[in-house]
A protein has these predicted regions:
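Acidic, low-complexity central loop/insert segments
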Residues: 3-5, 11-12, 57-207
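Glycine-rich, small/acidic residue-mixed loop/short-helix segments
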Residues: 216, 222-228, 236-238, 242-327
């Protein structure tokens, strides 16, 4: 059972110290101080101008917080956060670079199989109600696999993507791959890279360096409900985000697009979206071919062009009509 090795993998930063929640709260867009042990939330880390430095999830545990971000430049975020630590009791370090990720459609079959594997680390995190709870909230779990005296710690993130509960597991690559093989033998198969990518696109979950970059402001991802708290108080980047909220819209936004027919996946990402008069209306950032032969993807689109007829021409010369899905 292969572990996930594409851009849907997460890299982790680990935060410890009694001031960690308050510190992270002050440097990301969501309400970290409100997180209870065993919960998690999506968040952006931004600079003072609300430009995105990183995006992902913050997971709360009794003794630490974990920051899960898409592969990109975790060292830059680590350097950014550490430069603001002065007298606070907080330490932030990078996780082991050999860590890897498994991803599953989260259902009770998965939890049953994992309970058979686990050596519990504090509490019964893999409870029968965990899947039902994930429909309304994002959860974090931590457990061990292997023999009790030398178990390997695994961290899990339970989220809802495109209205489907999804479980990500991360840990050392070797033991995690072995766990995946045992689960597969038990009839529980991890999602393939293409399945994860299709879910990610339908969820409109951006990858830094592909769908979003450091010149983008956090609200342009249009994940305000999931990742931005407008009531948490001050944090780095809060003022520009509040101004955009007061304006009522951004000038460009990340949207799901459906493409009328197969599109050369390898060459389509980065292609411009054009209006009927040839004006550039946006850029295709991610694309995947569905089993039904229709391509869908993500695109950064000018808001005033979202309802216009658009088309894209890939590097092979294929011109396809593009429909921008409502947010």
């Amino acid at each position: 059972m292969p572990v996930v090795q594409n851009a849907c993998s997460f890299v982790r930063l680990l935060a410890s110290g009694r001031d960690r929640a308050k510190f992270l709260h002050n440097f990301c867009t969501n309400n970290i101080k409100a997180l209870e042990t065993g919960s998690a939330c999506e968040a952006f880390f931004t600079d003072v101008k609300a430009r995105i430095l990183a995006h992902g999830y913050v997971l709360a545990f009794e003794d630490a917080h974990e920051i899960w971000i898409s592969p990109g430049d975790p060292a830059a975020l680590l350097k950014h956060l550490n430069r603001y630590i002065i007298t606070e009791d907080v330490a932030i370090v990078a996780d082991n670079p050999s860590s890897a990720t498994l991803c599953f459609h989260a259902d009770e079959n998965v939890l049953t199989a994992l309970r058979a594997e686990q050596v519990a680390i504090g509490g019964d995190e893999l409870s029968d109600g965990a899947i039902a709870a994930a429909v309304d909230q994002t959860l974090s779990i931590r457990f061990g696999i292997g023999e009790a005296e030398q178990n390997t710690a695994v961290t899990g993130l339970l989220v809802t993507w495109a209205k489907q509960p999804v479980l990500f597991l991360t840990g050392p690559a070797g033991p995690l791959a072995a766990l995946g093989s045992r689960l597969d033998a038990a009839g529980v198969s991890a999602l393939s890279n293409d399945e994860i990518e299709s879910l990610r696109i339908d969820e409109r979950y951006p990858l830094m360096g592909r769908d979003m970059a450091s010149e983008n402001m956090a609200p342009e991802a249009e994940r305000n409900v999931q990742a931005i708290s407008y009531t948490k108080g001050c944090y780095l980047g809060q003022e520009p985000i509040a101004r955009l909220d007061a304006m009522g819209h951004v000038n460009r936004a990340l949207r799901v697009v459906e493409i009328s027919g197969p599109c050369e996946v390898a060459s389509a990402s980065g292609c411009p979206l054009k209006t009927t008069d040839g004006t550039t209306a946006g850029t295709l950032t991610s694309v995947i071919l569905r089993p039904d032969g229709i391509s869908h993807g993500l695109a950064m689109v000018k808001v005033n062009s979202i309802h216009q007829p658009l088309h894209v021409t890939d590097d092979s010369g294929n011109e396809r009509m593009v429909h921008v899905r409502s947010a």
